[in-house]
Amino acid sequence: MDGSGPFSCPICLEPLREPVTLPCGHNFCLACLGALWPHRSAGGTGGSGGPARCPLCQEPFPDGLQLRKNHTLSELLQLRQGSVPGPMSAPASGSTRGATPEPSAPSAPPPAPEPSAPCAPEQWPAGEEPVRCDACPEGAALPAALSCLSCLASFCSAHLAPHERSPALRGHRLVPPLRRLEESLCPRHLRPLERYCRVERVCLCEACATQDHRGHELVPLEQERALQEVEQSKVLSAAEDRMDELGAGIAQSRRTVALIKSAAVAERERVSQMFAEATATLQSFQNEVMGFIEEGEATMLGRSQGDLRRQEEQRSRLSKARHNLGQVPEADSVSFLQELLALRLALEEGCGPGPGPPRELSFTKSSQVVKAVRDTLISACASQWEQLRGLGSNEDGLQKLGSEDVESQDPDSTSLLESEAPRDYFLKFAYIVDLDSDTADKFLQLFGTKGVKRVLCPINYPESPTRFTHCEQVLGEGALDRGTYYWEVEIIEGWVSVGVMAEGFSPQEPYDRGRLGRNAHSCCLQWNGRGFSVWFCGLEAPLPHAFSPTVGVCLEYADHALAFYAVRDGKLSLLRRLKASRPRRSGALASPTDPFQSRLDSHFSGLFNHRLKPAFFLESVDAHLQIGPLKKSCITVLKRR
């Protein structure tokens, strides 16, 4: 009767509508059962007033059994109708006899292991809601003991009895209770996931196995799980190690973010203060210039206006005397002589020439002075802006940033960096170094991202523009700037050099100029089998220290310094700290008689004009080193911070 598929009603032979799951596990339409059971009670099997029975297996059920909709099966039916065309979307007709039966019909189940007997209700953790039986009355459902992937329902121990007694139900696959049964079904075919493809590493149903994965290595899920459980501890350990590394990286990134934010806030405050001072200086200069103009204007204007008044008064007197002379009668000789004398006296008062215009106005030079200041300011701003962006030379540009500020902020830190100090102090600046395989020379064999060894046979690495071609060297990933960084290296065997190299240094340089410390773009600490020495710009400075298998490197970018330490028993002993000496007030350098220090004084600061990378040179044929040991101890410190 159920030849049309497990998602069809055995009564109407159409796709299930409001599916109901009986305690025996069979599914029917709610309307079909409602129409069938009154008829069977009246005259069907069991006789009038007899118990209702399953139309398929004739399992009797007590009177008053409440029929409840199977919501999980209903959701699966909606998913199947919306995504996969098939028999469910086609209307039932009389020709269904010739249709291909659904492969996953309960009447022809795929081979499966022997079903286990119904078990006691699952013991659920405290506070977690157990999966309820789908066949129990609503509101009184017991915890499910098993879930049936064929019936798409979960059953308690009592309602699992039909799966034990009925031969048609014994082939159903029973699994521990599942809260979402659809997750154990193929989303494409809505069949139980029973196989595992090792080629594509996915779980499959039988239909997927026969259609899309022919020729692949397929195994039962239980077999693959048993195999994977053996590898589980290794995977968990690797995940834990990776999480520890990420934790260290996160701590370091957080320190970097905090450093950037605090540095930006402090720099903004300093810049704002300096701009305010510069603005105040310009405002004061403007007031002085404007006052000078006003003072010059008042002085010269007062003198010119006084001359103007005197000339106007003299002209007025001459005009009056001339007029009076013209009014004298011809017969009045006395008046004539008096008025003529008055006119002559008026002429004698201002017989000299009047003051001419000034040859030069002194305050008119103010604009020239201000223009010179403006041009100088514009030029200085443009030049310093180029220096700030890194477009100009460092010698005539910006001053070294923050050297005095760093020392004044934490005087104890400098003393720790220049003497013996506990290792925990440096772990605050721990930097996780990963070797960059794209830079490794062909005679270097990498072990993950932490180990490297020189070999005799070349390794066929892929071509890379950053790969060293003439020197057995390798760089670390990432470029360093604007901070303090610390990492450690274990010298396992051979001649090894450890240091830093400028990011833009060409890896195709010849052997004599491309080696670490043999140019102005790198510096290093070398162990040559007999003792330690430091190299920079082609000069070597031997160090009187015994061999230490673990070497610490501390890059102080803000202070333009690089320090090397011997790590023993949780303490660090300074081997050498490379830094340019400060010039004395007379202009002489601190150590003019030391050629190596003189070379540092003249060229070492230029190394910090670039971003720097950790660098490693394996000089002898048996050289071998390992990055570390910044492991659990370092991670613990970083996590505490």
Curated annotation (Swiss-Prot):
Cellular location(s): Cytoplasm; Nucleus
Modified residues (Phosphothreonine): 72
Zinc finger residue extent: B box-type: 181-221
InterPro entries (alphabetical): B30.2/SPRY, B30.2/SPRY_sf, ConA-like_dom_sf, E3_ubiq-ligase_TRIM/RNF, TRIM47_SPRY_PRY, Znf-RING_euk, Znf_B-box, Znf_RING
Domain of life: Eukaryota
Reaction catalysis annotation: S-ubiquitinyl-[E2 ubiquitin-conjugating enzyme]-L-cysteine + [acceptor protein]-L-lysine = [E2 ubiquitin-conjugating enzyme]-L-cysteine + N(6)-ubiquitinyl-[acceptor protein]-L-lysine
Pfam families: zf-B_box, zf-RING_UBOX
Annotated GO biological process: protein ubiquitination; regulation of postsynapse assembly
Keywords: Coiled coil, Cytoplasm, Metal-binding, Methylation, Nucleus, Phosphoprotein, Transferase, Ubl conjugation pathway, Zinc, Zinc-finger
Pathway(s) annotated for this protein in UniProt: Protein modification; protein ubiquitination
Chain ranges of the B30.2/SPRY domain: 413-634
Region (Disordered): 81-123, 396-416
Coiled coil: 305-325
Binding site for Zn(2+): 186, 189, 208, 213
SMART domains named among the record's database cross-references: BBOX, RING
Modified residues (Omega-N-methylarginine): 585
PROSITE patterns: B302_SPRY (PS50188), ZF_BBOX (PS50119), ZF_RING_1 (PS00518), ZF_RING_2 (PS50089)
General function of this protein: E3 ubiquitin-protein ligase that mediates the ubiquitination and proteasomal degradation of CYLD.
Family named by the database record: Belongs to the TRIM/RBCC family.
Protein name: E3 ubiquitin-protein ligase TRIM47
Species this chain originates from: Mus musculus (Mouse)
Lineage start: Eukaryota, Metazoa, Chordata, Craniata, Vertebrata
Gene name of the record: Trim47
